């Protein structure tokens, strides 16, 4: 699979030969969906909580007499039928949303995503992504010159300058290969990978 090798202006100056084992696989939509959903589920904190009728702090006094008012009978204001009452099936903080994906499936799914990005022209290679200072403005100008509005940058090493320069940019995420995840790969319109990071991706997902 041949990928575009971009310069600082976003122009393709050469071709980068990527191995078919990682960047030339068939797209497996079911597998990609499975690893994306599993990644999102595993990222959940599981701390959301609501109260049932027992946990809501309300008086147990009967709100009005049983008969003679014309209203539906009511026992206490903590009933789920009442405003401010407890939930019938509340979310509990001890819920476990973890989904297990074995390593072989995960590697195959990531390779499938990378292959599809390459076929769609959304994956490109650059020599490096070094910046001289932690200033955001020069890096933003560089991405603008390359016509990149929504971009995931996978760099072999994210030093302090690159991290500080990129963290305040909208629709820009800079990560090292080990932190590349399926959700980010499918979310951003363009994925830019440095040459050294390409070698690491090949080792990880071959």
From Swiss-Prot:
GO terms for molecular function: rRNA binding; structural constituent of ribosome. One of its GO terms (biological process) is translation. Gene3D superfamilies: 3.40.1370.10. Pfam families: Ribosomal_L4. The keyword DNA damage does not apply. Signal peptide: none annotated. Residues 46-77 are annotated as: Disordered. GO terms for cellular component: ribonucleoprotein complex; ribosome. It comes from the Bacteria. Belongs to the universal ribosomal protein uL4 family. PANTHER family: 50S RIBOSOMAL PROTEIN L4 (PTHR10746), LARGE RIBOSOMAL SUBUNIT PROTEIN UL4M (PTHR10746:SF6). One of the primary rRNA binding proteins, this protein initially binds near the 5'-end of the 23S rRNA. It is important during the early stages of 50S assembly. It makes multiple contacts with different domains of the 23S rRNA in the assembled 50S subunit and ribosome. This is Large ribosomal subunit protein uL4. It comes from Albidiferax ferrireducens (strain ATCC BAA-621 / DSM 15236 / T118) (Rhodoferax ferrireducens). The lineage of its organism: Bacteria, Pseudomonadati, Pseudomonadota, Betaproteobacteria, Burkholderiales. The gene is rplD.
């Amino acid at each position: 699979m041949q990928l575009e090798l971009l310069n600082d202006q976003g122009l393709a100056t050469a071709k980068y030969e990527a191995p078919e084992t990682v960047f030339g696989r068939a797209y497996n939509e079911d597998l990609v969906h499975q690893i994306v959903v599993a990644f999102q589920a595993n990222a959940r904190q599981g701390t959301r909580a609501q109260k049932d009728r027992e946990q809501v702090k309300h008086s147990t006094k009967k709100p009005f007499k049983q008969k003679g008012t014309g209203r539906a009978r009511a026992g206490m204001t903590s009933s789920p039928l009442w405003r401010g009452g407890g939930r019938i099936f509340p979310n509990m903080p001890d819920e476990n949303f973890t989904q297990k994906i074995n390593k072989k499936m995960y590697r195959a799914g990531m390779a499938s995503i990378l292959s599809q990005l390459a076929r769609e022209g959304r994956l490109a290679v650059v020599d490096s992504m070094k910046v001289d200072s932690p200033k955001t403005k020069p890096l933003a100008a560089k991405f603008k010159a390359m016509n990149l509005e929504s971009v995931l940058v996978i760099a072999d090493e994210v030093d302090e300058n690159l991290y500080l320069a990129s963290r305040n940019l909208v629709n820009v995420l800079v990560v090292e290969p080990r932190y590349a995840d399926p959700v980010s790969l499918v979310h951003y319109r363009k994925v830019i990978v440095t040459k050294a990071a390409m070698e690491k991706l090949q080792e990880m997902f071959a």
